[in-house]
Regions:
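P-loop NTP-binding core
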Residues: 1-172
């Protein structure tokens, strides 16, 4: 059974991408089949995976060009698979919201979900539609934070959002 873990915190610089990449690499090192999804337009998880950002197909292409989800998956240099991020995800976030396609990502991942033991989702440092899509897909969420007031401040709001999402069916 595929375990889907979102790495989320609306504050930037708290270690979301570092956690996501290292968790994916560690699980892959133990012979687990791992998919890392980079939902951050900065694309740092993509870069860390050894993928050149300008030579990729991602969820943007899947949404706008009907590219198959399988064609969005790349092999990382550390043995896990990755669906890359990049700046075009900004347009995807707006389109999902404007087209009222909440739950798009969950539906998109169905055909490949059984191919992996773990799916790790690296979310952007904002509470936008891409983050909500990632949280909706997840069966669990890791919230990295620094031991400082401003890092802790947003955790309650994020936990309330996670609870709200878990009580709603976005795919209807």
């Amino acid at each position: 059974m595929n375990k889907v873990i979102a790495i989320a915190n609306q504050k930037g610089g708290v270690g979301k991408t570092t956690t996501a990449v290292n968790l994916a690499a560690s699980l892959a090192a133990t012979k687990r089949k791992v998919l890392l999804i980079d939902l951050d337009p900065q694309g740092n998880a993509t870069t860390a995976a050894g993928i050149k950002e300008n030579a990729t197909t991602n969820l943007y292409n899947h949404y706008f060009e009907n590219t198959s989800i399988e064609d969005c998956v790349y092999e990382s240099s550390d043995g896990y698979k990755i669906i890359p991020g990049g700046e075009e995800l900004i347009a995807l976030e707006i389109a999902i919201r404007n087209d009222n396609k909440q739950g798009f990502m969950s539906k998109s991942l169905e055909p490949i979900s059984l191919n992996y033991d773990y799916t790790i989702i690296d979310t952007p440092p904002t509470l936008n539609q891409l983050t909500i899509e990632g949280l909706f897909c997840a069966s669990g969420t890791l919230i990295p934070l620094q031991c400082e007031y401003y890092s802790l401040e947003g955790v309650t709001g994020l936990m309330n959002t996670i609870e709200t999402i878990s009580n709603k069916n976005m795919s209807s």
